[in-house]
Structure formats: C-alpha cells, structure tokens
Amino acid sequence: MEAVKHLSAAAAAAAAAATCSDSPAKAAASPAASSDIAEALGELKASATAAASSASKAATSKHHSNNNHKPSAAATATAAHKKSESCNSNGNKCTAATSPIGSKTSNAAMAAATATAAAATNDLAAAAAVVLSLQGTMVSSLQQAALLPANSAAAAALNLQALESYLALQRLTGKSDVFRFSNSNTGSSNSNNATTCNSSSSEADNNALPSLIDIANIELKSSCSSSSSGEPPLTAATASAAATSSPSSNNSNSTSTPTTSKCVPLPSIGTVSAAVAAAAAAAAAAASQQAALDCATAAELAAECDLPLLDGEDALSFEAGDLDSSYGSFMFNPSAFSQAETDSALHSLQATMYQDKMSVISGAAGGVGAGAVGGLEEAGSSAAAAAAQRSKKQFICKFCNRQFTKSYNLLIHERTHTDERPYSCDICGKAFRRQDHLRDHRYIHSKEKPFKCAECGKGFCQSRTLAVHKILHMEESPHKCPVCNRSFNQRSNLKTHLLTHTDIKPYNCASCGKVFRRNCDLRRHSLTHNLSAGVGGVVGGNLSDPFGSGSSSSSELGLPTGSASTAASSRDLVAVSD
C-alpha cells in the first residue's frame, strides 16, 4: 500500500513537470521526478506479492469499507494507471517513462479485482445453497403436514418447522452482508485547457453482484473461460472496473450507468399462512370423507351380519370378544354407533315377527316325521334368535337356570318348582299361584261372565278364555298340524300335538331317568319326587298323595290302574296347570 501511494505521488509530480517543461528551471526538476518514479517502481516490484495478499484480505473485509472516503488498493492502482495514460502530448518524455508502470499496475489491479469477485461469488454461492436448503425444508414440511390429520400434534410440529424455516429465510435475505444490491456511482467531469482523468468513485466491492438465478451462469462462464485461455477469468466486477477507466482529451465527458441486480422474492408470511390453512382444510375434508365412508361401510356390515340361529337346547353366551382393529373409526364414531343401535332394534322387531309366523311356515315342510321335527326345530330356533336380540336377562331361576327380565316373573316361576299357592278362594278353598288367576276364578262363583264374544255372544269368565274362543270363528286356524291337518286354537297345544307324531321324548327326569314328551309332564313328575321326600318316601309300594284327594301315582310307576285313579290323575293335572 505504501508503494502504491509513492507511485501515485511520483506520477502526479511527473505530470506537473511535463506541463511546465517550457521554463528551464522546471525542466531541470524533471530528472528528479523520473528518479522518484524509478524508486517507486522498485518498491512496487518488491511488494507485488504483498499486493495480492492485501487484495484477498480486502475481499473478506469489504463490508467495513466506506465508498466515499477510503478507496481500495485496486481502485487506487486503476486511478494511477489512468493518470499515467492521460498525460498531455506535450510531455513525450513523461509519457514514455510512465507507460511501463501503467501496464504493470493495470495487471495488478485486474488480478486483485478478479480475486475479489471470485471470493464474492463463492460467498454468494454458499448463501444460495443455504437458502435453497431452507426452502426445501419448508416445502417438505408443508407437504407432510397436509397428509396428516388437521388437529394432530405431528401436523402442528411440521407447520411450526415450516414457519421457522420461512422466518430464517426472511432474516437471511434481509442482511446486506449476504446479498448486496448496490448501484455504481456516477462520476462526470468537464475539463477545458487541461488534461484530466475521469474515474468512478466506487470501489470494486460496490459493483453489482449476480443474483441467485445468475450464479449457475456465472460459474459456467468462468469455467469455460479458464479452460479456453491461460489468462485469469474476468467476472462482472472486473469488467465493470475496466469499463470505468478511459483516457480523455481536453474536452471529454464520461458517465457510468448504474446497474442494479434483483433477487427472486420469497413468499410473504400471509402467503405461507394461507398455504398452511389450505393444507389443514384439505386434511379436514379428507378426514370427514373417510369418516362418512366408514359410517356407510359399518351400516352395510350391520345390515348383512345377522346372528346365527340357536338350537332349542343351546345356551346363550355373552362372552366379550376382541374388537377388530380395522373398525376403530367406526367404534368411536357417534353417528355410526347410533345407526348400529337403530339397526339392532329393527332386527329385534323382525325376529319377534318371524317367531309368530313360524307356525304357518312349518306347514310347508315335507314328510310325516321329518316335517314335524323340522317345524319344531325352526320354531325353537326362531324363539332362540328372538331371545338373543332381547336385552340381557338378569334374574335366573335357581332350580332350572331359566332367565327372566323381571323379578316378579321369576317369583311366579319358582312357585312352579315349590308348588306354592298363596292365593286361595274364600268360597271353595282352591289355591292359585297368581292373584289374577284368583280374580278370574271368582267369576265362576258369581256366575258373572263379563267377557263376551262379538261373533256368537258367548260369555266367558276369563279374558284368556275368550281369546282362545275367538280362534274358533276364524276360517282357518293359524295353528294347524302339517301332518294330520288338525287345527288348534292355541300354539302350545299344536306343539304338544306335534310330539305325538314322533317318538322323541326330549324331557328326562334327573332323579329316575324317565323321559317325557311334554315339559309339563316332567314338572308334574318332578313334584312327586320332591313331595315324597318330604313325607318319608314310599309306603307299601305306593307314593303318598300330595294333594290329599286319594289319587294314586301308580300310572307313573307303570302299575295297573283303575277308573278311579285315572280320574284322580286328570284332576291333579288340572290343578298343577293352574
């Protein structure tokens, strides 16, 4: 730097001596100025390497320089070169003496400017790589967040990451140290009667740098120029510095046009927020569409998947099974769950209606024995299916494990096992298990028949008796045997009659192993075992009379019976059935 300063001072002295060569005294001072220039040239040669290193250091510390006060070494060397070339034609000796110095100074300035531009290009390329990486991170985060549910924690984290990347981009592009967009100053001068040199006052650091889009083109041109010639490549900064130095005549006007480089603008925070909101809305729409599809699929499955029919002897089980993981969205969807409950209620109603029509459908069965058994099994299956659709039965009989939904029904049922009859008639003393049966019985003593038939006008003491009577007025009884076409006014009578066409005796006694066709026969037989154990067992080969009517149970034991015992047994059957 000191050598360049001496060189500038010597060049100025030589120019002054050349302009004043008319007087002998000033001509004598010219050799002294030439000697000063020679000494400065020697010092410049000695510090050639120092100038290159100082130029590279100047490139790293270029943001600390002031454009209006501290010119760089490259600009000073360029100015000295222009001054040495702009000497007047009257001083031929001065021009000849300073021309070698100007050429070497120009080479040094070009080298320094090239190094500065290369360093700036490398810095800009690194900054561009960081910017592109942040942009890629932001875009990938937004894309991944759009694929996730709107209210999930992962989507919120990805949106936050995208916002942080955007803010980092805004801070990075807002720094002048990373992206500089400066205008080259305009310098102009008008000179008359004197030789002047016009140069730009801006440093090489203030020249316009390439934008992000032009980085690839600059590097491509640099590689092509370096491979084609051995000369150092000239960048946009070097070309701009060379264009600012031009020799001028007595009347010259020079003007440098300012150039400005622009970068691709990044999206604003409003644009990013709108993109995030649009992605969240798209994710919410996709989730709602998937929920609607799951709801429709669940409704179809609920409509198609009916419970299999159970046999008459199969017990109902309410074991809980593992849920299928593929129906997670259906199980936690309130609308789909309510739809499933509605479908379940509809299926229960259909099963109940199906049970009432089974007796009519059983008439289509073919064969004598097979048709009867098939109709019975279908009736039992329908009853079991209807029972499966009903609510859980909480009250269980301790004798036969039969289930009931109400405690009163369980109490009445257990009285069939214990033969408890707490309601007795005060007129005849007959006892009943239920109070409504006693009320209907009292109409017999009063001769009152409040229940009249609308068809024939016949009166009945009990409402259930009238209901049974109305079936007789129908054109075709709904309870008809498919084997012998016999009609019955009660369904229970038809079921009992169907067993007479087969040899099936499904009811067996647990105490003695005897089998029966009807359940009522088995219950009556079981009562004989319970009551005989209470009075002391069998005496003289005959069971004790449980009803106190002198009846004998010899018919159950296979003993010969008379007419009196047969009549007593029929009376016992009527009493138990009540």
Swiss-Prot record:
Protein name (database record): Protein sister of odd and bowel
Lineage, broadest ranks: Eukaryota, Metazoa, Ecdysozoa, Arthropoda, Hexapoda
Gene Ontology annotations of biological process type: blastoderm segmentation; embryonic hindgut morphogenesis; embryonic pattern specification; imaginal disc-derived leg joint morphogenesis; negative regulation of DNA-templated transcription; negative regulation of transcription by RNA polymerase II; periodic partitioning by pair rule gene; positive regulation of DNA-templated transcription
An example Gene Ontology molecular-function term: DNA-binding transcription factor activity, RNA polymerase II-specific
4Fe-4S found in the keyword field: no
Location(s), subcellular: Nucleus
SUPFAM superfamilies: beta-beta-alpha zinc fingers
Originating gene: sob
Gene Ontology CC: one annotated term: nucleus
